[in-house]
Amino acid sequence: MEKVNAFLKRKNIVFSAKRYGIDALGAMAQGLFCSLLIGTILNTLGSQFHIGFLTAQIGEKVPYTIGGLTSFMSGPAMAIAIGYALQAPPLVLFSLAAVGYACNLLGGAGGPLAVLFVAIIAAECGKAVSKETKIDILVTPIVTTLIGVGTAYVIAPPIGTAASAFGLSLIHI
């Protein structure tokens, strides 16, 4: 048990309510604010004040507005913010972008909640393997991404279903 504790300490993996419930959740809120909420604000400003560049569609294959693009990146922004709060090394941090995107895509209404759980799991697993091999530049992103996207595939849809059911139950009160 001493070896496990020493390894976790060396990797800065701390299992605590403060780390996950306050630090990670607070960072997630910042990621959400800097993406979804700012995107909504930009869209509203563009619509209400007829600011063309804020309402103009950009992109040919998938047309978005600036605010729409910003909102669309809420999953990656939240996951990266969570990784930052957990003091994840750079290769883990950058790999969390795909993890956050997968959570939001697969989680529907529960995407943000799925991001919280999955990003914590993926970040801690990525931290555990980081700098343990000579091919760290491959191992760390692969482990972080596969664990994160795999976990998202398993738990994000049920979280989304539960979030939708909860939302519908509130409507019918």
Where would I find each of the regions flagged by the language model?
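Early transmembrane hairpin of solute transport permeases
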Residues: 7-140, 144
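A cytosolic-side transmembrane-helix exit/cap motif
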Residues: 138, 160-167
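Membrane-interface interhelical loops and short amphipathic "cap" helices
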Residues: 55, 167-169
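Short, membrane-interfacial amphipathic segments enriched in basic
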Residues: 2-17, 155-163
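Conserved small/polar residues in nucleotide/adenosyl-binding loops
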Residues: 171-173
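Short, charged low-complexity intrinsically disordered segments located at boundaries
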Residues: 51-53, 153-158
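Small-residue-rich segments of transmembrane alpha-helices in multi-pass membrane proteins
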Residues: 143-154
